[in-house]
Amino acid sequence: MQLFHLCLIIFCSCPTVQASKLCLGWLWGMDIDPYKEFGASVELLSFLPSDFFPSVRDLLDTASALYRDALESPEHCTPNHTALRQAILCWGELMTLASWVGNNLEDPAARDLVVNYVNTNMGLKIRQLLWFHISCLTFGRETVLEYLVSFGVWIRTPPAYRPPNAPILSTLPETTVVRRRGRSPRRRTPSPRRRRSQSPRRRRSQSPASQC
């Protein structure tokens, strides 16, 4: 029971609207998904293995290097920036709470249990959130959604019937361009034929006028 109350504090201590909604959803049985408004879902993210996501420190360094000005700006940039701010703040509060609990629990076993719970469960959720929103800002939301769907299809396909390598997010735009180039010749081929067929007509229609 003490662990239940501690987990409740961990879930509800984040001073963000999104974290509060997650806490209320857990208590009241509401179906609240932090990815739903972005076209994804927790289930879709769950297809990616836990070791796929970089560490929280690496993700925070990436967010700071690429989007620090936008994250610190008082202006509203995009929903992804807002969600990224909330995830960063939530992780900071979780670390503060975990440090406080670790320093005040006398039982080493209980202290290790709390630290492992935060790092394993909440750490994975934060890594997923950070990765998703950083990737949306870097590659575009549609590309990230296409990647999640592609990976989900790949991982659920029996090994004998799927490519040996999983899809790679950074190569998806190149794949999309290749597909578009493969379709474009079919759209461009009629135009030269029309120009070739129309040019003699113009000369024939103009020839009587020139003879007159």
Curated annotation (Swiss-Prot):
User: Which residues bear the site annotation Cleavage?
Assistant: R183, S184
Question: Region (Disordered): which ranges?
Answer: 165-212
- InterPro entries in the record: Hepatitis_B_virus_capsid_N (IPR013195), Hepatitis_core (IPR002006), Viral_capsid_core_dom_sf_HBV (IPR036459)
Maturation-removed propeptide residues: 184-212
Q: What is its main location?
A: secreted
Region (3 X 8 AA repeats of S-P-R-R-R-R-S-Q) residue ranges read: 184-206
Q: Where is this region: HBEAG?
A: 25-27
User: What molecular functions are annotated in GO for this chain?
Assistant: DNA binding; RNA binding; structural molecule activity
User: What keywords is this UniProt entry annotated with?
Assistant: Disulfide bond, Host nucleus, Host-virus interaction, Repeat, Secreted, Signal, Viral immunoevasion
Which Pfam families has this protein been placed in?
A: Hep_core_N (PF08290), Hepatitis_core (PF00906)
Q: Where in the cell is it found?
A: Secreted; Host nucleus
Give yes or no: UniProt keyword Signal: yes
**Gene Ontology biological process terms from the UniProt entry:** microtubule-dependent intracellular transport of viral material towards nucleus; symbiont entry into host cell; viral penetration into host nucleus
- Segment forming the signal sequence: 1-19
PTM annotation: Phosphorylated.
Note the subunit structure. Answer: Homodimerizes.
Give the protein's recorded name: External core antigen
Organism listed in the record: Hepatitis B virus genotype F2 (isolate Brazil/w4B)
Traced from the root, the source organism's taxonomic lineage reads: Viruses, Riboviria, Pararnavirae, Artverviricota, Revtraviricetes
